[in-house]
């Protein structure tokens, strides 16, 4: 088959042009004036229930006398006498008049032969078409029955259908018109053949009026067919009687396999019946399961396609100047199809192109039309699919427009026009002809169930069809429901050379809409003077400036012979753009009506005929003290056609002519600009300013005229604003108007007229006022009601080289704890020539918690000495080492923390050195303050993990003493090392800090629920003496660092703490008394002892030589009595040490025993015995 279908013919149809009710309402006021006359519509009514309007056609009779007829089919009209039926249908002809009920029934189909036929419900008038002016008419009854063997057992009734062809005067002349046409009569009957032919469901004439086209969708089991027969117009056509007929299945072959339609919708159905009849209306349909289907070849897949449901023709569809026929099959392949056919032989129509539908059950091909929409010489194809729907986009009904590509149809992506849901958009189509006289045919689309029904008018163009409807006719406007079910156009019924439109309905009513002639108006606005010089008053009296305006009109129309007198009403509106901005106009019209506003003037001009030029004058005066001297004064001319009053026509009078209308595609307005003579704008008289916002930064207000810039973030572009109760904040702004290039100052930097700075504030800031360092530079700033939008006048004009600096005072009352950023949008504005862009001033808002932390250690110096003890040997805290106490104080100078979050005081306690040995042993942690009612200051984790005994009595006593008054016993006792380390071998100092990795810390965290003033954390600990003796005995000094900080847990992201940490150092030394013993090398001591012994020996020898040891003789005396006392072993050692002169102390942590057996030796007189040095001597054994 020629013209194969493309793989994706719907590739470009995704865009659906839907014009629903809302759009119709928006456009109706404009569309009603273009160009079908709704107000003067002619209404025709038929018998109730007759379906008068089911089909319609426009017809013009030329012989024997000119007459225009509205042909209306009424397929349910009552039967005529003699037809022996109740309802047979009929064709009605309505004259062009104002009467609504003056239609008469065309006299056809008289009588009935009940032995051969039945006319009951034959639906005469189901279709009606006219050849045009002076042409024939065809109307059909597709349910007409042919009968055989009436009242016999083998009686048959075949719904073959039939058509009537009438002459132009609505009479039947059998010798020329053929009278009754029944091509299915006499053919094989039954629904598989021609028993349900239903000829005349669609009928049409070829554009050359040579052929008559019939659609018979019921043939071949509703596969359908199309038939083309010669339609003789006169004796000249008698020579071509052998031309046809042509049929899709073959006139002679009558072969259903030749029917060119795709697969059908009902393959696989089983007929189940217990009635002895072949009438398919009495069959019950059942779908067979796959297992129940009989094996064998597949059945005919083209049944029930309804080929011939719509039919038309055109020349040039496939080949230039060659006539082709188009038939619709709306149920083919469940989607519908349209087939383009050509004559192949004396009896066959051969398919050339097949176009398939897009969606299932869309009814593609239900209606169709052929028209050259783009006037390229190749007719295009319009196809209706009224059952199309799109659920997501809420579309219902579609019309596809295929633009002929030089006879090639493969790969064409049609334009899809859509209607509203359930509207049946596309059930009827009509070619209107050139409705607007632009050289391109127009079409009409019916949507009878869109509200009360609508008809959409689409204009053709060089690109095809304009997707936006130019006019929408509504059934509601004429009081008809199901309006638009049938359409007919392309004929001029009233003689004004514009085609008209006849619309039918299912409400027994038809309406004719006549097209209005279109006027093309030319207009011109003249202005004097062209420029306004404010220094040259020219009004009467010489005090003001005036401007004269003149407007002139003329028109042309199609046809050139149409030349009525028309009246145009015009309005001149000054300062239109300024008023749209809400500003006061600068002019006043002097020649205006009193009821008109001062910025408007109106008038009327009468144009007697085409090309007649008529003018009107007006004058306006410029107001005094005009500020806007740069923007031009815009004068807008608008005009409209004065509509004549409708006069009531008396019965019997002819139709009044329709009033003309202005071309809707031609603008009916014109703008003219009147400029001011510009000063300070350079030689070109174009003010090219260079306004620049060189500074926009947030500041803290120190005084009324003193501001301090806020600190900037690390990016250098965002200020940091601390929310600490300050009521206002300043925004420093500096604006300049300097040339962008000093080397070319004439390029820009001209005066900036009406220079403004527009400030848009966030909800958290509100305008409060403006300040300037120089009062002369203070701009005028005005804000709106809620102080969120500020306009500052910078000058009118802001001169070349000017610079202004000022501060906006902004209230911070709207800033809350949720506010994280302040962004103020700034935009410079001027009516001078300059492209300006908005800029933003930003500040990051943070909430600074007024918490401070400080710490101290008591004492700040610790000493170590003694002996090394293991961890298991520790029983009490006194066994560990020197005690130390830390106090960390947190102060709150602001609001309660409860409103912001949860705060924690953390202390990093260095409990180990890097190798894991104890450093500072935590004994006790207590928090004083910082708690709410009923809350305890519990810190975690718990200290004293070795559970050493706490000497609470001794602790309380020592805490009350200042550090310098502590007992010597609290100092470290030197170790009993007799191998002291020299000072030269000692290192300088070591720092033990967790932050440096030289120590390991445990973090004690204490919650601060709520406090107003201060909270104090007390931490007691002990210096682990053994670690220092083992690791740092050769170190001169050690610095132990304890760190503390405050953390806050809060959902507020912009909290910030300053001074939220502290460092508490403690110096640790080897005990200074241990340094005396251990600071001298051993060999020095040995030499000193030997030297001392030598000196002693020499001294004794010298004294002996001198007789020092010889005593004088004394008289004998009574020798006193002594008591023997046992001296403890440890005291003996002390006595020995005192004799040698070496001073030693007890080991640290080993107190001196003072028992009852350690007492001095008493002499006989009860007093202590004195030693050689004059002091009491120790007891002796």
Curated annotation (Swiss-Prot):
Ligand binding (Ca(2+) 1): 372, 374, 376, 380
UniProt-annotated binding residues for Ca(2+) 2: 434, 436, 438, 442
Cytoplasmic topological domain residue ranges: 1104-1181
Keywords: ADP-ribosylation, Calcium, Cell adhesion, Cell shape, Cleavage on pair of basic residues, Congenital muscular dystrophy, Disulfide bond, Glycoprotein, Integrin, Membrane, Metal-binding, Receptor, Repeat, Signal, Transmembrane, Transmembrane helix
Topology of this chain in the membrane: Single-pass type I membrane protein
Sequence repeat intervals: 1157-1160, 1165-1168, 1173-1176
Major site of localization recorded for this protein: membrane
GO cellular component terms, semicolon-separated: cell surface; external side of plasma membrane; integrin complex; plasma membrane
Listed Gene3D superfamilies: Bicelle-embedded integrin alpha(iib) transmembrane segment, Integrin alpha, N-terminal, Integrin domains. Chain A, domain 2, ntegrin, alpha v. Chain A, domain 3, ntegrin, alpha v. Chain A, domain 4
Transmembrane segments: 1083-1103
PANTHER family documented for this protein: INTEGRIN ALPHA, INTEGRIN ALPHA-7
Protein name: Integrin alpha-7
Extent of Basic and acidic residues compositional bias: 950-961
Region of interest (Disordered), ranges: 950-978, 1138-1181
One GO BP: muscle organ development
FG-GAP repeat positions: 35-103, 110-175, 185-238, 292-349, 350-411, 412-467, 471-530
InterPro entries in UniProt: FG-GAP, Int_alpha_beta-p, Integrin_alpha, Integrin_alpha_C_CS, Integrin_alpha_Ig-like_1, Integrin_alpha_Ig-like_2, Integrin_alpha_Ig-like_3, Integrin_alpha_N
Clinical disorder: Muscular dystrophy congenital due to integrin alpha-7 deficiency: A form of congenital muscular dystrophy. Patients present at birth, or within the first few months of life, with hypotonia, muscle weakness and often with joint contractures.
SUPFAM superfamilies according to UniProt: Integrin alpha N-terminal domain, Integrin domains
Annotated positions for site Cleavage: 647-648
GO terms of molecular function: integrin binding; metal ion binding
Origin species: Homo sapiens (Human)
């Amino acid at each position: 088959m020629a013209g194969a279908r493309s793989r994706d013919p719907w590739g470009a149809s995704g865009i659906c042009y839907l014009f629903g009710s809302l759009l119709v309402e928006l456009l109706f006021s404009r569309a009603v004036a273009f160009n079908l006359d709704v107000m003067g519509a002619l209404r025709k009514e038929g018998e109730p229930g007759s379906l008068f309007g089911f089909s319609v056609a426009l017809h013009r009779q030329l012989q024997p006398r000119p007459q225009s007829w509205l042909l209306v089919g009424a397929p349910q009209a009552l039967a005529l006498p003699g037809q022996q039926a109740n309802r047979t249908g009929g064709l009605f002809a309505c004259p062009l008049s104002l009467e609504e009920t003056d239609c008469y029934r065309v006299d056809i189909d008289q009588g009935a032969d009940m032995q051969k036929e039945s006319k009951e419900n034959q639906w005469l008038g189901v279709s009606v078409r006219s050849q045009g002016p002076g042409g024939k008419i065809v109307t059909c009854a597709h349910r007409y029955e042919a009968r055989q063997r009436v009242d016999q057992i083998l009686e048959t009734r075949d719904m073959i259908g039939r058509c009537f062809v009438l002459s132009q005067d609505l009479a039947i002349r059998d010798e020329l018109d053929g009278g009754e046409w029944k091509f299915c009569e006499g053919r094989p009957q039954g629904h598989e053949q021609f028993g349900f032919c239903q000829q005349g469901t669609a009928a049409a004439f070829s554009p050359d009026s040579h052929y008559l086209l019939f659609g018979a969708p019921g043939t071949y089991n509703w596969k359908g067919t199309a038939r083309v027969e010669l339609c003789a117009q006169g004796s000249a056509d008698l020579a071509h009687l052998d031309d046809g007929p042509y049929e899709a299945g073959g006139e002679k072959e009558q072969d259903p396999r030749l029917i060119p339609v795709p697969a059908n919708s009902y393959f696989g159905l089983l007929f189940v019946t217990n009635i002895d009849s072949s009438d398919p209306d009495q069959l019950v349909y059942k779908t067979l399961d796959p297992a129940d289907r009989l094996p064998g070849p597949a059945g005919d897949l083209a049944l029930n396609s309804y080929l011939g449901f719509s039919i038309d023709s055109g020349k040039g569809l496939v080949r230039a100047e060659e006539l082709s026929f188009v038939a619709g099959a709306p149920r083919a392949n469940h989607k519908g199809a349209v087939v383009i056919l050509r004559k192949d032989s004396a009896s066959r129509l051969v398919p050339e192109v097949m176009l398939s539908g897009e969606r299932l059950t869309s009814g593609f091909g239900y209606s169709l039309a052929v028209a050259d929409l783009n006037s390229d010489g190749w007719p295009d194809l319009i196809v209706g699919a009224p059952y199309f729907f799109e659920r997501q986009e809420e579309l219902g009904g579609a019309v596809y427009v295929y633009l002929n590509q030089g006879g090639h149809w493969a790969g064409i992506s049609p334009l899809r026009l859509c209607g509203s849901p359930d509207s049946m958009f596309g059930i009827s189509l009509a070619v209107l002809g050139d409705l607007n006289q632009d050289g391109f045919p127009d079409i009409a689309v019916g949507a009878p169930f869109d509200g009360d029904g609508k008809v959409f008018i689409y204009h053709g163009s060089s690109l095809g069809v304009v997707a936006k409807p130019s006019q929408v006719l509504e059934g509601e406007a004429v009081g008809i429901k199901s309006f638009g079910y049938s359409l007919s156009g392309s004929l001029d019924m009233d003689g004004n050379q514009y085609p008209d439109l006849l619309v039918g309905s299912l409400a027994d009513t038809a309406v004719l809409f006549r097209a209005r002639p279109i006027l093309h108006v030319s207009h011109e606005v003249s202005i004097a003077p062209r420029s306004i010089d404010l220094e040259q008053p020219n009004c009467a009296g010489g005090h003001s400036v005036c401007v004269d305006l003149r407007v002139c009109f003329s028109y042309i129309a199609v046809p050139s012979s149409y030349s009525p007198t028309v009246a145009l009403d015009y309005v001149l509106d000054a300062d239109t753009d300024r008023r749209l901005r809400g500003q006061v106009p600068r002019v006043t019209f002097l020649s205006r009506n009193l009821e008109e506003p001062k910025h408007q003037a109106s008038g009327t001009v009468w144009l007697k005929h085409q090309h007649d030029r008529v003018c009107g004058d007006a004058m306006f005066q410029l107001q005094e003290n005009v500020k806007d001297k740069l923007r031009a004064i815009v004068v807008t001319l608008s005009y409209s056609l004065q509509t004549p009053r409708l006069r009531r026509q008396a019965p019997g009078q002819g139709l009044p002519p329709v009033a003309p209308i202005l071309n809707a595609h031609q603008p009916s307005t014109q703008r003219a600009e009147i400029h001011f003579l510009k000063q300070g704008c350079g030689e070109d008289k174009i003010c090219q300013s260079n306004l620049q916002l060189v500074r926009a930064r947030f500041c803290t207000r120190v005084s009324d005229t003193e501001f301090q810039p806020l600190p900037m973030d690390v990016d250098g572009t965002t200020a940091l604003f601390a929310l600490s109760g300050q009521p206002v904040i300043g925004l420093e702004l500096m604006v300049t108007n300097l040339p962008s290039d000093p080397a070319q100052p004439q390029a820009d930097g001209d005066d900036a007229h009406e220079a403004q700075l527009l400030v848009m504030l966030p909800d958290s800031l509100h305008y409060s006022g403006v300040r300037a360092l120089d009062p002369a530079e203070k701009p005028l700033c005005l804000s709106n009601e809620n102080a969120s939008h500020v306009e500052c006048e910078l000058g009118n004009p802001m001169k070349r080289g000017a610079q202004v600096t000022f501060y906006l005072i902004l209230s911070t009352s709207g800033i809350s704890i949720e506010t994280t950023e302040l962004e103020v949008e700034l935009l410079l504005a001027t009516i001078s020539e300059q492209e300006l862009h908005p800029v933003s001033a930003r500040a990051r808002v943070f909430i600074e918690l007024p918490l401070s932390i400080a710490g101290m250690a008591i004492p700040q110096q610790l000493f170590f000495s003694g002996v090394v003890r293991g961890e298991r040997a520790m029983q009490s805290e006194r066994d560990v080492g020197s005690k130390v106490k830390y106090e960390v104080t947190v102060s709150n100078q602001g609001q309660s923390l409860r409103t912001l979050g949860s705060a924690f005081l953390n202390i990093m306690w260095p409990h180990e050195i890097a190798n894991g040995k104890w450093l500072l042993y935590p004994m006790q942690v207590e928090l004083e303050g910082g708690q709410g009612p009923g809350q305890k200051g519990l810190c975690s984790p718990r200290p004293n993990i070795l559970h050493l005994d706490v000497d609470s009595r001794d602790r309380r006593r020592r805490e009350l003493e200042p550090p310098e008054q502590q007992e010597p016993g609290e100092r470290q006792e030197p170790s009993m090392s007799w191998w002291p380390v020299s000072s030269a071998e000692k290192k300088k100092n070591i720092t033990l800090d967790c932050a440096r990795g030289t120590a390991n810390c445990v973090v004690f965290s204490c919650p601060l629920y709520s406090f107003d003033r201060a909270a104090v954390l007390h931490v007691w600990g002990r210096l682990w003496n053994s670690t220092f003796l083992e690791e740092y005995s050769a170190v001169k000094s050690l610095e132990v660092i304890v760190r503390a900080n405050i953390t806050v847990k809060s959902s507020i992201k912009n909290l910030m703490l300053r001074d939220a940490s502290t460092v508490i150092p403690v110096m640790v030394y080897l005990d200074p008394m241990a340094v005396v013993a251990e600071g001298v090398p051993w060999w020095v001591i040995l030499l000193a002892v030997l030297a001392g012994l030598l000196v002693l020996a020499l001294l004794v020898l010298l004294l002996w030589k001198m007789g020092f040891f010889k005593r004088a003789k004394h008289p004998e005396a009574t020798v006193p009595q002594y008591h023997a006392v046992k001296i403890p072993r440890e005291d003996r050692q002390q006595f020995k040490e005192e004799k040698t002169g070496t001073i030693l102390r007890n080991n640290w942590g080993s107190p001196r025993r003072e028992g009852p057996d350690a007492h001095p030796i008493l002499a006989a007189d009860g007093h202590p015995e004195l030693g050689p040095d004059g002091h009491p001597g120790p007891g002796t054994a």
